[in-house]
Amino acid sequence: MGGIGCFLVLALARFAAAPAAEAVKYEVYAVRFATISNFPVSSLIAGADRARRLDIAMTVWVLKGGNGSVALVDSGFHREQYFRQFAVKDFILPSDAIAPLGIKPDQVTDIFLSHMHWDHAGGIDLFSAARVWVQKDEYEYYTGVAWQARNTHGGIDADDVLEIVKRNTMGRVTLVRGDDETSISGVGFHIGGKHTWQSQYVSVETAKGRVVLASDNAYLYENLETHKPIAQTLDAEANVRAQESMRALASKPNLIIPGHDPAVFDRFTRVSERIVKIE
């Protein structure tokens, strides 16, 4: 074998023997920035008793990466109109709610947006440096055809849409194309089962295993424990399938975190009055 051939064989052998890069590990925190009181459980769990009420947690999730990144899953809300529509109490700005973790708003590098409803997309403007990650189909629908009829953009705030479009014109929106576990080390994006046009949920690698942040694709632990679809979905069967996928992804069942269940803040280690660490 010639010299060039030997060199190629040795180079390939070294490449094959090189260990794969280890995924970035994250610390994950649930941050409660508000409560909505007396919320009907029948709007959360399909078929639930209409008389049931629950004080639901309004939450963003912080992902602190071992590589120095700081990401949020969802951004909360702060527009005044929603304080008139809902019984909001104990509110602080999401950008202030993360302060006990030593994070300033301009240190947030990314927002992984589960969907474009007002209570999840309404705080993007509070984090001026962040790149927004949203499903491509979700973005295209709610920046376009959804506004051609009166009943196809429920829960979507036009000002939130304009903020995301503005950020896109600045080159700071990434359109996620379906399931994606390769774009960001240690983070996976997964189709969420049609809570909105194309909602998504997020999986995160931590030192204790893989955490799944369901957001509104599973509102409460009860959705997950009773295999009940969420009440607000465009496709109940797809939502149940998404919940099954969450179970397969999470390292342990207790590492699937629902979107609005106040019990999250009783089940995990408290860091401050409004924050628990998911582990």
For the regions a language model picked out, list residue spans one by one:
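Bacterial N-terminal signal peptides
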Residues: 2-14
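Metallo-beta-lactamase
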Residues: 22-23, 92-103, 107, 137-191, ...
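Divalent metal-coordination and catalytic microenvironments
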Residues: 28, 63, 74, 108, ...
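Conserved beta-strand hairpin/beta-sheet module of binuclear metal-dependent hydrolase folds
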Residues: 34-96, 201-218
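Active-site metal-binding motif and surrounding structural segment of the metallo-beta-lactamase
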Residues: 88-134
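Cap/insert and terminal regions of metallo-dependent hydrolase folds
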Residues: 91-92, 199-279
